[in-house]
Amino acid sequence: LTNNVSIENPKSLLAYGSRLYIVGNDFYSTDINSLQLLGQVGGFVNASHCAIIPQNRAFVSDRDESSVKLIDLNDYRIISEIETGENTSPSIIINKYDKSFVLNGGNNMNYDSTLVTITYKDDLIPLADFSGNLVIGKNPSSAVNSGNINVLCAGVYDESNPSDNIESSFYNIYPTDLLINFSQNLSGIYNANNLVETSNGNNYYFTANNGIYRTNTSMSNVNLVIPIQSDVLNITTEKYAVNDSTDAYSNFLYMNDLNNSGTLYKYNINLSSFVDTISVNGQIIDLAFKN
């Protein structure tokens, strides 16, 4: 960071307005343009991800304490803590309507299969109340909130004990009443993660044990499209040159390569081809786009 502060053990990023939030051993708030540190909050055992909620507050999941901690972004302090269950390892947090949806991520040794909700407002009254619990697939790993809440579950993937493996799965959930609309096992796919959606809402992409997959939103046509092992994947829309006189817009995937540390690939979905390779010093842990 620009004011000589080191981020200890960075794990995830969230770009939100003029801020870039970084979760590491602590929670860090920075200016997205200058990367100047604006605030820092400690008090976590194993912080994982964050989400910004109304009234200038943030939720941060703490995997080892099986809780979500509420941060006041005015004075950068933890003001409450919401338990998510015993040994649940909460991770990803996404917002929809008046709630945050928390994925209890589990792991290969102690898997979890739950999604919990925390209601953060009632009209204009700020809240932070546990409000629901839903059993879904093994080890929920990522989600998008287009229309319903769409959750990808990693299953169990252990290369040294393949007999213990459990296939990944997908759940489409009504956000208002926390009921499952439909679910789908992903045959032959393990360790699915990093669910992203195209801008037209027609397709998802996600990472898995043997590469990056594309699917329609009903999960009825799932195909391996990029055979690169990756654990960082994000999507954005950019303009590109079709020829000397014509430009077009496409979704672009950005992904790391687990077999080539520090390598980031850029993939044009319209062209179904890689268009750039970016090299950085060090391991790529997460990727966020400035709005």
Residue ranges, per PLM feature:
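Solenoidal tandem-repeat scaffolds enriched in leucines and small polar residues
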Residues: 77-171
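A short beta-strand motif characteristic of beta-propeller blades
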Residues: 1-6, 34-42, 77-83, 122-133, ...
